[in-house]
């Protein structure tokens, strides 16, 4: 059996110490990185708290009327002129007093053609279809909206049929045609709505009809990006890790 002398042990110690220090450095570096990397938002169930962080300050306005809000139940209806359509005695009236997270491309439009939807509807898709879960929770497709209008919109597609809308919600310009199942949003929301549809088509392959494409291309040109839309896109990137390329390129061109 080979004996280790005092001199050989002294030579081995620096090597052992160096390896130990190197191991500790690698361990602590990987630990630091794991804490530094925030998990990216990827599902609708956990989207609420993240969206509340995104829509603060100037971005805390609802999609359909531009009403500012502070907290989900504190909507300032004076600047936007919103007035509930429903009778205060009806249960649905409560939704007029709160902010909800609206899918610009509806969950039905994202999922009704998928096998999971046919087998059990939206809930089944949420829990059993990973791609649908990504679509449903994509922050680019979610926007704060007054609950009553969100409910009235239902699964209706966006459209444009009049330049003189007859008010339905006070002086708010968004209107809903329940018979034809379509929604005409206010002018200030149209460009953003168009660019979100382009994003969802590119990101997830949700095809647009010829009619919808023509409408959204027109809206995209008529209603260019604003500083607020560009800021929204940057905030979403912080939490989700990606930007809407149709917004990003337009923001750069506009100098935002």
Walk through the language-model features, giving the residues of each.
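Secreted/luminal cysteine- and crosslink-motif detector
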Residues: 9, 30, 66-68, 81, ...
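N-terminal secretory signal peptides that target proteins for export/translocation
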Residues: 1-17
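Aromatic-lined ligand-binding clefts that engage carbohydrates, nucleic acids, or primary amines
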Residues: 37-98, 216-218, 228-229, 236
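Bacterial N-terminal signal peptides
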Residues: 20-30
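Secreted/extracellular small peptides and ectodomain modules produced from precursors
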Residues: 27, 63-65, 78, 114, ...
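Alpha-helical and His/Cys-centered functional microenvironments
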Residues: 13-14, 28-29, 106-107
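Domain-level detector of nuclease and nuclease-like folds
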Residues: 83-85, 89-256
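Sec/Tat signal peptide C-region and signal peptidase I cleavage site
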Residues: 32-36
